[in-house]
C-alpha cells in the first residue's frame, strides 16, 4: 500500500475538508476530446484552482497514466508503481495489466521512487472526486531528457494498444520556481508557447536555453509525444502563480494545459 505523504500539508487530511476544497476548485465539464493534460502539483491553496480547471475537463477513463518528476532522488530513474494508492478519500488500484503490457525498455517497477514523492499523489484526489471506476498508472521520472520522454510515451502507447484501455495521460508539473512574479510570468509564457507549438525539439531547446526551472519538463514532453502521436493540439486552460495568493517577490508558476484530438 502506498500511503499518502502530503495529506495534511499539500491538501487536507480530513476527507470532508478535502471534498469541500475539491468542490470549490472544480467545475465538471468533461470533454471527450481531451486525451492528456498538464496539471500543477503544489499545495492546493496555491495551485488547486488551476489544477481543478484542468481536471474538470478530463473525460472518464479506464486508466489515468500520471507522469510526475522525482523530487527526492530515491528509487529507479523511470519508476512505475504497482501498489494500491491510499488517500483520505480511499484506495485507488493500479492497472497492473496495463503496467505488464508496457515493454519495460526504459520503465521498471519500483515503489521507492514513489514513497516520498508528492507530484503524483496530489493529482489522485481530483480523480477520486470527479471519476468512478478507474485505475491509475503512476510513473515517476528521475530522468527527463528528450529520449527518455519519447520512450516513456511509446511504452504508454504500446500498452494502450495491447490492452484496449481508454487512457488519459496527466503530466504533473509546475512551471518556473522562485522568481519575482513578473519575471516568472514572462519566462513561463515562453515555455507555454513552446508546449502549445507541439514541437518537442523546440520545447527542449527552449527549456535548455532558458535554463528553465520547470520541475516536470520531461513529464510535459511525455504528454506532448503521446498527444502528437494521436494528432492532438494543445490549449492553455489556465495560468496562475503563487503570487496570486501569497508573496509576489518569489513565486512559482502554474500552467493548466489540455491536449485535444
From Swiss-Prot:
Residues spanning the membrane: none
Pfam families, per the entry: Memo (PF01875)
Alphabetical list of InterPro entries matching this protein: MEMO1_fam (IPR002737)
Coiled coil regions in record: none
The family this protein is said to belong to: Belongs to the MEMO1 family.
HAMAP family found in the cross-reference section: MEMO1
NCBIfam families, alphabetized: AmmeMemoSam_B, PRK00782.1
Name of the protein: MEMO1 family protein AF_2310
Organism of origin: Archaeoglobus fulgidus (strain ATCC 49558 / DSM 4304 / JCM 9628 / NBRC 100126 / VC-16)
Amino acid at each position: 500500500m502506498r500511503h499518502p505523504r502530503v495529506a495534511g500539508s499539500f491538501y487536507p487530511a480530513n476527507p470532508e475538508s478535502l471534498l469541500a476544497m475539491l468542490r470549490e476548485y472544480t467545475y465538471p465539464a468533461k470533454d471527450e476530446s481531451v486525451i492528456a493534460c498538464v496539471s500543477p502539483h503544489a499545495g492546493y491553496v496555491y495551485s488547486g484552482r488551476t489544477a481543478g480547471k484542468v481536471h474538470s475537463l478530463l473525460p472518464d477513463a479506464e486508466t489515468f497514466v500520471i507522469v510526475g518528476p522525482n523530487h527526492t532522488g530515491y528509487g529507479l530513474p523511470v519508476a512505475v508503481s504497482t501498489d494500491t494508492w491510499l488517500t483520505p478519500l480511499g484506495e485507488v488500484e493500479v492497472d497492473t495489466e496495463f503496467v505488464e503490457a508496457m515493454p519495460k525498455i526504459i520503465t521498471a517497477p519500483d515503489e521507492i521512487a514513489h514513497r516520498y514523492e508528492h507530484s503524483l499523489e496530489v493529482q489522485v484526489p481530483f480523480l477520486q472526486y470527479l471519476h468512478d471506476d478507474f485505475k491509475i498508472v503512476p510513473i515517476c521520472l528521475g530522468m527527463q531528457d528528450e529520449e527518455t520522454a519519447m520512450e516513456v510515451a511509446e511504452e504508454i502507447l504500446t500498452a494502450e494498444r495491447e490492452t484496449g484501455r481508454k487512457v488519459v495521460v496527466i503530466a504533473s508539473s509546475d512551471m518556473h520556481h522562485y522568481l519575482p512574479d513578473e519575471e516568472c510570468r514572462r519566462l513561463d509564457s515562453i515555455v507555454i508557447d513552446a508546449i502549445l507549438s507541439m514541437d518537442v525539439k523546440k520545447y527542449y531547446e527552449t527549456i535548455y536555453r532558458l535554463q528553465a526551472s520547470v520541475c516536470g519538463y520531461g513529464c510535459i514532453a511525455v504528454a506532448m509525444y503521446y498527444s502528437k502521436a494521436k494528432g492532438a493540439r494543445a490549449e492553455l486552460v489556465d495560468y496562475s502563480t503563487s503570487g496570486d495568493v501569497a508573496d509576489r517577490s518569489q513565486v512559482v508558476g502554474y500552467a493548466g494545459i489540455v491536449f485535444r484530438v
